């Protein structure tokens, strides 16, 4: 394993932590309608469990309304049940093969709960980033021990790894701040 591949791997894994964090935040309900709100939901279809977006189109016709167009008439009931039982507090209105889902206003208590959950997701992303940093530092120490890089090179690369970690955590904090203001905005 060479230095370049270690640094590329660290960058890729830290970017992955940010992507996973953003994906988790996408599932949090804010005051605004978003198709990503329903994407994690699963429904039993044709003998297996699949995501809703594999049996229907999800769109946002209005800022506080989601629309789900189910492709197979036999799946409408299952999709409606999945949305109703999701714990998101949504009540779909069935209209043939389409479901309209009005998003109710979030109360202050629920908003604070969502912010708390967002902070938990952010902490998970920070921890994942720190684990990646630790792996990178261990690899650099191993290369130094094996004599592939000098002590000075190892020190310089360690600083680069720390800088990359700091940038990634700052990015996570920035994304969290945007999501927090989105949730708390009435």
Swiss-Prot record:
Gene3D superfamilies named in the record: 3.30.1360.40, Ribosome-recycling factor (1.10.132.20)
Q: Which Pfam families match?
A: RRF (PF01765)
Positions of transmembrane segments: none
InterPro entries named among the record's database cross-references: Ribosome_recyc_fac (IPR002661), Ribosome_recyc_fac_dom (IPR023584), RRF_sf (IPR036191)
Q: Name one GO molecular function term.
A: ribosomal large subunit binding
Subcellular location, in the record's words?
Cytoplasm
At the top level of its lineage, which domain of life is listed?
Bacteria
Q: Which CDD domains match?
A: RRF
Disulphide bonds in the chain = none
**Which GO BP terms sit in this record?**
cytoplasmic translational termination
A GO cellular component annotated for this chain's UniProt record is: cytosol
Key words of the record: Cytoplasm, Protein biosynthesis
| Main location, first listed in the record | cytoplasm
Q: Which family does it belong to?
A: Belongs to the RRF family.
Record's function text: Responsible for the release of ribosomes from messenger RNA at the termination of protein biosynthesis. May increase the efficiency of translation by recycling ribosomes from one round of translation to another.
Q: What is this protein called?
A: Ribosome-recycling factor
**Which organism encodes this protein?**
Bartonella quintana (strain Toulouse) (Rochalimaea quintana)
Q: Which gene carries the instructions for this protein? A: frr
């Amino acid at each position: 394993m060479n230095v370049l591949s270690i640094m590329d791997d660290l960058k890729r894994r830290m970017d992955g932590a940010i992507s996973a964090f953003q994906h988790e935040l996408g599932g949090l309900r804010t005051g605004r309608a978003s198709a990503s709100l329903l994407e994690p939901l699963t429904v039993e279809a044709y003998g297996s469990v699949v995501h809703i977006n594999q049996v229907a189109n999800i769109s946002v016709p209005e800022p506080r309304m989601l629309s789900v167009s189910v492709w197979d008439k036999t799946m409408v009931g299952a999709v409606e049940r999945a949305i109703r039982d999701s714990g998101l507090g949504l009540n779909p209105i069935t209209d043939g093969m389409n479901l309209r889902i009005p998003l109710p206003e979030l109360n202050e208590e629920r908003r604070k709960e969502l912010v708390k959950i967002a902070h938990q997701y952010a902490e998970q992303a920070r921890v994942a980033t720190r684990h990646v940093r630790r792996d990178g530092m261990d690899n650099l120490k191993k290369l130094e021990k094996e004599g592939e890089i000098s002590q000075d090179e190892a020190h310089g690369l360690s600083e680069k790894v720390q800088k990359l970690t700091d940038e990634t955590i700052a990015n996570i904090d920035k994304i969290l701040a945007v999501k927090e203001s989105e949730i708390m905005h009435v």
